[in-house]
């Protein structure tokens, strides 16, 4: 299985790796690991659709039997028995389908959560220092849960309903070859309409997940930094910021609802139902079909209602799940330039520190430190004084490679810290920080 690999600051041995080249490939690689549960769900879906088709066919036969000159009560009873048996079997198949997809959904959620957690352990301290905690928590909890919902009820209902689309295609021609026309045209138009619906829904669901992440990020920061907020009398400003983020999330959710309200397949189904019934009645008037066959054919067309109605919810859930998977992958695949450097320098540390023309900046912002040079001898005590935001903490974090210098070199015992084994470097450095909080 092809995977995306990267350097890590910390690694945990894993026996299983997954394809991270895209959200669909990634989700599929997780599903493939649980193929027995997927096969169980698909088998249950096929059996459920087959048993659902039995009822209209038997009802049509019962109608012809009742309308005959000498109806047989015994035959009617046998039809009733077969209907009852088929629906009991259908219930069993539904249970197998639901159990299989719920099983795979829970296992995939477990594996995704574990994969994300191990990946976050391997991220550098630079990453965790700059990445908002609230956004990480939103991806690690709610987005992972959306991947669960992608399988159940998402794929559970989609795969279960797709079989209902094809049952009329196979059963209708047995009454008359021309009767395949209506369900065939409906299926083709349904696929086109559904494709356009999903394409238009993708950016909306991405915005829903992104807005939720931003809302969660700001809320987490406000709660963690509540002392700072109250100390600066910024309660009203924080309420305003939270209100704007909540409004953004609300607008995205409303837009998703508006797009779902314009779901075209519901209209196409009702048109197909009317056209199909009219076609069957024309054949009945011509003596080609009998009353029981008309009833059976109309019952087969009614099977199209399930995939049409359920896809309104199910495909939205799949789109949300893929949006969540996309956000999780973006977090896991984010570049990490800091490596453990297992083969690096790791002698006993003496404690000499030297900064040579060191400059550092956060992302695309201006330099936090610029062309800084000084030396500290072993045993020497140095006090660094400056106002908040002047770069004091940043300077100390360059020594243990929480950050790497943008320009210049930081040396410990005469060697660039990049040449040191990371564990050996940090094991010999102690840092005690004051209780501070800076908003992102």
At which residue positions do the language-model features occur?
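Membrane-integrated ABC transporters
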Residues: 1-53, 67-79, 97-101, 105, ...
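Juxtamembrane loop-to-helix connectors within ABC transporter transmembrane domains
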Residues: 23, 31-34, 97, 101, ...
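Transmembrane helix-loop-helix hairpins at lipid-water interfaces of multipass membrane proteins
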Residues: 38-93, 173-178, 287-291
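A hydrophobic transmembrane-helix motif
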Residues: 54-61, 89, 155-198, 254-296, ...
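Loop segments that connect adjacent transmembrane helices in multi-pass transporters
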Residues: 114, 119, 129-134, 207-255, ...
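Cytosolic ends of transmembrane helices, especially the final helix of ABC transmembrane type-1 domains
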Residues: 211, 231-234, 267, 304-331
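ABC-type nucleotide-binding domain
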Residues: 340, 348-440
